[in-house]
């Protein structure tokens, strides 16, 4: 790897970003799903900053969990004396396998499932830490408060305010589900949070068209009728989903694995789906405001089927695009990103397809 590392340093020359580190990850037998996602998260600037800050403030008394193992790995990379090389994320992978049997086998795993699990696990750890800190602060002020603090959450069935962690602040958006009764025209809106958007895909489409389909109006009729509270009965209705609060980091998962009933198994959709380097989010509640996003990472699935294959990642760092394939790290041209859109033909020799896209908000325009 020394040679490959120095090759990358030579390629970047005096353009090598000050203080940045580019390290490949060792593969522990089919852990490419994990390596590719971790590289994407490492180059997600707000995530890396918050994780390292949290680690610096809490490492003395922290018991080991996925958060401490991930922070330890990121800290290890950022504090390397060398600019390039290989690191073994052994402690993190061991902890992951210890906690979740799904990732224990040497079978091919799903990168999106892993990302989803990891973000939710980090949220849970941070929420528990916040609750513990609150309880400590309240009980330390006066001993007689202890009994009240323990009873408080149960009293009168009071709804507790949800805890907003730094993971929420980075990745969480809000969707609003609007349903319009076609008899009385009453609109019912229900909000739900998301950490990523999973989009259905079609051949020769784009992220913009996939997002439009995601927010398209659907008519509920026959056995799918909607119970209208105003009419007090089941009625035909129109339903649509819009983005009420766009996240700072928008994670898009392209649903490339589809269950084929006639085959009785999943099939990979190699469809060509164009994802732009700059994305305007238009399916928002406020239709007059376009939110602009910039692509900074792509997790790519390599292979023709869902149960085998490989994951790699493309990452944008300081205006350079890098290609991470386990231990290997190479610089690539920005134009090379479009080779991962997918295939126009069903049977193609190109099996490297964008699977998870990470965009950072540039704000409103």
Curated annotation (Swiss-Prot):
Keyword Nucleus part of the UniProt annotation: yes
Record-annotated USP domain positions: 23-362
Protein name as it appears in the record: Ubiquitin carboxyl-terminal hydrolase 4
Active site as annotated: 32, 310
Lipidation (N-myristoyl glycine): 2
A Pfam family the protein falls into: UCH
Organism for this UniProt entry: Arabidopsis thaliana
First-level EC class: hydrolase
Gene3D superfamilies for this protein: Cysteine proteinases
GO cellular component, one term: nucleus
Keywords, alphabetical: Hydrolase, Lipoprotein, Myristate, Nucleus, Protease, Thiol protease, Ubl conjugation pathway
Originating gene: UBP4
Function: Recognizes and hydrolyzes the peptide bond at the C-terminal Gly of ubiquitin. Involved in the processing of poly-ubiquitin precursors as well as that of ubiquitinated proteins. Required for the correct development of pollen.
CDD domains linked: Peptidase_C19G (cd02663)
